[in-house]
């Protein structure tokens, strides 16, 4: 059963304090003397109540209400009035009041209404029937999965999007994703992500709570992405957050969930004695070596005679838990008046990884993974007049992470490479030295093998990240100049900071060099430091790193939309500029601002919704090319035909309710080149010289036999470097059955 109200449950949410709100009556003359109160309930086709349905008296814009948490409403009407019942995603109904005093209204879902308006480039809305580009819309409800990262919900849900999760470690467990694969040989491969009109990172996307998302669109082909120029070469994801609502009483939503994380597959490990038997059997049958383990070792290990001389260590069970419990809570409030509307959301997420907190057994600190994430979203819209609106969007993200110095991947690898019988986790202390005698192995194939527990507990990291994004959006309708003309401007500022404090200490490892059995059956052991160095008391040292960046973005555009009979026209011209600065530059080039500027345009036409055509273009500048190549032009064109709008299609509309054919062709560009560490190389057309002060050296001579110190060319100047250009051809059809 598909519920329209959020579930009041551990994995659900609920609305509080939302009641039927009757809009104040401004024009009292609209109420006739026979007015009386009518009550009702609005439900979906499964009988579930629908919250927030608009009940409006037709022809009386000042008289209306919305349904409460139980789908109930009441409103003063006269017998001649007609009620208009509407809600996003459902077919609008009109009901004559007459002598009725109580109503039960069932709304039917309408897939065409759900997808009627598609968010296209730069957040402009366009009717789906007139879209000729390859654009997929995603319902926010489809993104509500028990995961702390939004990108983990992409896999298997979004056509044309490839998503895979590289790690399950909290703080690093977001998915990498591509739109229609990788479209460049040298540059960035991830898609452009736009949040409320501003470019953000995949980490910013992952931090979003699904509850704040109003719309989610994926732009795939050149026609859909051309206006973003080089930034959109790998596809574009456009996310818009919720706005406020004109309502006397606020609508409050709460969602609390707990989820359990477990590995998809845990390797099955044999006991130590069985490992030794299998090892001996393998070297015997393959004749690759001598039998390493004696029968006495195998028997003593099986019988647990002494766990230090004949260890039997379950390394995986010693380091990892079977599962982890994570908690998430979300609170939002929505409301406003005709002049000011608001939406606010606060989220808290607590994640713990699969690692055990073993360091507290040996030291005075914790080393397991513990992540606290705090998010805040506040959207305010000021409707200054019928034609002027100012919107303020504020997004804040705070991450507080504690984790071991050694990554989970490296620890897992150490567990896989350490057999259970070569050394114990640690030898017992002798009462002389106050440090841990970590086990090690000095002979055989595993000589010098890493002790996984020592790697886990040798220190920890505290990582604090903060992200603040603020947008100011201004919209002015210019109908007084030209009907259908609109001006819109956006200014955005983003600041990201990251502080990493690493605390680490040395590891003293020991190996078993001898033992003897006492008459009472106990054993005396002789252990020696592993390696040639003398052990010293480990001291916890501290190292700190600071990083981050900030970005300023501005865009403005004119948009024109008009209809003349069966002819529909739409056009847009846009200018934008973007500046990126590092908060902790490491060299001269990194300290220079990275600026981008571009122009974009779009023109579309359709005749009676049947024959469609759209032309887009982006014109972008780049710092990476010399004069004459700095600017790149990337156009696209698309055509479409709504076959189902033709008269000859009527006989089969009961079977195929909608059919549209479309095709597009365009160019996309890339101006980036990555180095071996996957960092963008700037000013790639210029020569790069490493000076003698940087310990540079070069070889010379007829046989390259002489090495001298001095300046070295690491890159030669090339004024002919230019854009990487790719062609995109898209042919498809959209069909809806029944």
Residue ranges of each PLM-predicted region?
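Acidic, glycine-rich flexible loop segments
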Residues: 290-314, 328-330, 415-449
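Compositionally biased regions
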Residues: 30, 37, 286, 432-435, ...
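Extracellular/periplasmic, surface-exposed regions of secreted and cell-surface proteins
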Residues: 189-190, 323, 379-387, 394-398, ...
């Amino acid at each position: 059963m598909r519920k329209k109200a959020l579930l009041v449950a551990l994995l659900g949410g609920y609305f509080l304090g939302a009641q039927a709100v009757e809009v104040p009556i401004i024009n009292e003359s609209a109420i006739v003397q026979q007015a009386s109160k009518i009550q009702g309930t609005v439900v979906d086709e499964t009988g579930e109540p629908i919250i927030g349905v608009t009940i409006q008296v037709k022809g009386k814009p000042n008289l209306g209400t919305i349904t409460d948490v139980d789908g109930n409403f009441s409103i003063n009407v006269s017998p001649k009035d007609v009620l208009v019942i509407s809600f996003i995603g459902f077919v609008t109904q009109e009901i004559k009041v007459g002598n009725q005093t109580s109503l039960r209204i069932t709304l039917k879902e309408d897939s065409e209404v759900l997808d009627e308006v598609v968010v296209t480039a730069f957040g402009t809305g366009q009717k789906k029937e007139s879209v000729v580009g390859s654009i997929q819309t995603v319902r926010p409800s489809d993104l509500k999965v028990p995961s702390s990262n939004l990108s983990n919900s992409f896999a298997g849900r979004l056509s044309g999007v490839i998503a895979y999760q590289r790690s399950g470690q909290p703080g690093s467990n977001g998915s990498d994703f591509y739109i229609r694969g990788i479209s460049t040989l040298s540059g960035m491969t991830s898609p452009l992500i736009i949040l409320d009109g501003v470019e953000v990172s995949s980490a910013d996307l992952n931090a979003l709570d699904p509850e704040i998302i109003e719309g989610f669109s994926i732009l795939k082909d050149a026609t859909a992405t051309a206006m973003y120029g080089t930034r959109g070469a790998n596809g574009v994801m456009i996310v818009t957050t919720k706005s406020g609502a004109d309502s006397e009483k606020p609508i409050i939503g709460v969602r609390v969930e707990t989820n359990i994380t477990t590995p998809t597959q845990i390797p099955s490990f044999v006991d130590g004695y069985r490992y030794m038997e299998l090892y001996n059997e393998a070297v015997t049958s393959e004749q690759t070596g001598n039998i390493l383990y004696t029968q006495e070792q195998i028997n003593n290990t099986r019988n647990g005679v002494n766990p230090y001389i004949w260890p039997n260590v379950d390394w995986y069970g010693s380091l990892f838990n079977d599962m982890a419990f994570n908690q998430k809570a979300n609170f939002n409030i929505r409301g406003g008046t005709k002049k000011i509307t608001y939406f606010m959301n606060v989220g808290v997420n607590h994640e713990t990884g699969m690692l055990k907190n073993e360091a507290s057994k040996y030291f005075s600190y914790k080393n397991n993974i513990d992540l606290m994430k705090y998010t805040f979203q506040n959207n305010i819209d000021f409707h200054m007049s019928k034609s002027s609106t100012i919107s303020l969007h504020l997004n804040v993200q705070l991450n507080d992470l504690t984790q071991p110095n050694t990554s989970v991947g490296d620890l897992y690898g150490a567990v896989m490479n350490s057999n259970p019988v070569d050394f114990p986790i640690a030898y017992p202390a002798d009462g002389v030295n106050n440090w841990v005698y970590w086990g090690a192995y000095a002979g055989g194939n595993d000589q010098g093998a890493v002790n996984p527990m020592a790697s886990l507990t040798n220190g920890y990291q505290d990582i604090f990240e903060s992200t603040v994004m603020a947008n100011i959006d201004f919209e002015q309708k210019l109908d007084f100049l030209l009907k259908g003309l609109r001006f819109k401007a956006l200014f955005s500022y983003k600041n990201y900071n990251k502080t990493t404090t690493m605390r680490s200490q040395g590891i003293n490892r020991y190996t078993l060099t001898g033992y003897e059995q006492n008459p009472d059956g106990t054993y005396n052991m002789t252990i020696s430091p592993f390696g040639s160095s003398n052990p010293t008391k480990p001291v916890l040292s501290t190292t700190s790193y600071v990083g981050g960046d900030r970005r300023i973005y501005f865009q403005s555009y004119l948009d024109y939309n008009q209809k003349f009979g069966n002819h529909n026209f739409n056009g847009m011209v846009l200018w934008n500029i973007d500046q990126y600065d590092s908060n902790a530059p490491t060299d001269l080039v990194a300290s220079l601002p990275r600026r981008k500027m571009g122009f974009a345009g779009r023109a579309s036409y359709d005749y009676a919704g049947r024959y469609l055509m759209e032309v887009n273009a982006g014109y972008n500048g780049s710092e990476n090319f010399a004069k004459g190549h700095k600017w790149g032009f990337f156009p696209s064109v698309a055509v479409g035909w709504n076959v189902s709008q033709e008269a000859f299609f009527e006989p089969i509309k009961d079977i195929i309710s909608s059919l549209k054919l479309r095709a597009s062709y365009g160019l996309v560009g890339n101006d980036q080149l990555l180095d071996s560490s996957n960092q963008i190389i700037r000013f790639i057309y210029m020569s790069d010289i490493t000076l003698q002060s940087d310990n540079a050296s070069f070889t010379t001579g007829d046989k390259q036999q002489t090495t001298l110190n001095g300046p070295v060319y690491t890159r030669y100047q090339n004024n002919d470097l230019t854009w990487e250009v790719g062609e995109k051809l898209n042919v498809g059809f959209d069909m809806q059955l029944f």
